[in-house]
Amino acid sequence: MGKRLLDKLWEKHIVATNENGLDLLYIDLHLVHEVTSPQAFEGLRLANRTVRRPDLTFATMDHNIPTKDVWNITDHIAKQQLDTLRANCKQFHISLADIGDEAQGIVHVIGPELGLTVPGKTIVCGDSHTATHGAFSALAFGIGTSEVEHVLATQTLWQRKPKAMGIELKGTLPKGVYAKDIILHILATYGVAVGTGYVMEFYGETIRSMEMEERMTLCNMAIEGGAKAGIIAPDEKTFAYVKGRKYAPKDFERAVEKWSELYTDSDAVYDMHISIDVSKLAPYVTWGTNPSMGIRIDEQLPAISDQNEERAFAYMGLKPKQSAYDIPIKHVFIGSCTNSRLSDLEIAAAIVKGKKVKDGVRALVVPGSQKVRQLAMEKGLHHIFEEAGFEWREPGCSMCLGMNPDQVPAGEHCASTSNRNFEGRQGKGARTHLVSPAMAAAAALYGHFVDVRKESYDGAISYS
């Protein structure tokens, strides 16, 4: 019997196996940010240990940064965490993309754009959305702070091998429907626990037609389905994306030869399989307090079926059978490690070009990195957004989570391109609706959700 992509990635990194069936995996890349690392570094100091492979460790600042004025950090805890990361990176000789550095940005955006993320690697970070890097056929997953310390000290991690789930995507996406809608459809259909104990492998003709940034969106939210990780076999688009980046392999042709072996064999069998015809999908919007509480834009909100839904309706201030078009939007956030890359901003800019944000709506565009921001500004996208009434910000995690000044006031609704809509995720009492960049941009113009398929726009972005 053939091997799955998961098998090939896993077996390549086994250092040892213990009597309990756990495998000691070698870690090729450890990404670090300011929130989950302080205790890990302190643990090293208390044990008189050092970082085993600082050359395989890379740090950035993203969660706590105020994106309106990156140097005006007024929160004591945020400032302490940022200062601590600087000190730790200096002491342990770790590369750091600090505030103001041209490489700074959200950890799961800068990894791929710097060429740190390449096929075949094991990648970990003290952040649940590390699964993003699986779009490059890397086995990437989030870890806890104690595990961060273990990787810093040993460059290894004890893990139990997950099962393999195959998700086949067939057909062509309709206009106005994007990778974000695919993953929201999967969550709405199969729930937030479908992937528990699995690694999701996305494959099929739809995947091959996707660009790398769309694939990253899919893998980013595999964790929302309970999966350990999301992975995609590499192809020519993968190789072209990586080629020429700062940390890409020097002997690139040799690397591509090895990477080309990373695929699921034709006679391999998945432990679970799902098949989806994406040509039948529509734009999605979440209405509740977990990512599976989502509907097509042309559907009504559901009837209450259990206590969780009853609580969600009460928290969100919505009613069963209500139309998604009637949800009032006061805030729009285009950003996060899910949808803050150049193609995401281009789509949003195409929607709002020559139009105006609805009175009373606060709309933010937060590029995922300094590089994304620079490229967007070279294309004039910042002018398009600012003339429409959006705020153009500096890179950071921003309104994805309530850890910095970018928050949603209690009781108000936000159309967000982020990945989580839990109670209080964007601030105490905030009401979050997860959507694609196109849906978020359109909501900013109307002050409520609309079917972006009916909007007039194209992908040709220029500013004049």
Curated annotation (Swiss-Prot):
Q: What is its EC number?
A: 4.2.1.33
Q: What enzyme category does the UniProt record give?
A: lyase
**Which transformation does this protein catalyse, written as a reaction?**
(2R,3S)-3-isopropylmalate = (2S)-2-isopropylmalate
Top-rank taxon: Bacteria
Annotated Gene Ontology MF terms? 3-isopropylmalate dehydratase activity; 4 iron, 4 sulfur cluster binding; metal ion binding
CDD domains named in the record: IPMI
- Offer one example of a GO biological process linked to this entry: L-leucine biosynthetic process
Task: Quote the record's binding site residues for [4Fe-4S] cluster.
Answer: 337, 397, 400
Name the keywords, alphabetized. 4Fe-4S, Amino-acid biosynthesis, Branched-chain amino acid biosynthesis, Iron, Iron-sulfur, Leucine biosynthesis, Lyase, Metal-binding
Which protein family is named in the record? Belongs to the aconitase/IPM isomerase family. LeuC type 1 subfamily.
Report the function annotation for this chain: Catalyzes the isomerization between 2-isopropylmalate and 3-isopropylmalate, via the formation of 2-isopropylmaleate.
Looking up HAMAP family in the UniProt record yields: LeuC_type1 (MF_01026)
Q: State whether it acts alone or in a complex, and with which partners, per the record.
A: Heterodimer of LeuC and LeuD.
Q: What is this protein called?
A: 3-isopropylmalate dehydratase large subunit
The top of its lineage is: Bacteria, Bacillati, Bacillota, Bacilli, Bacillales
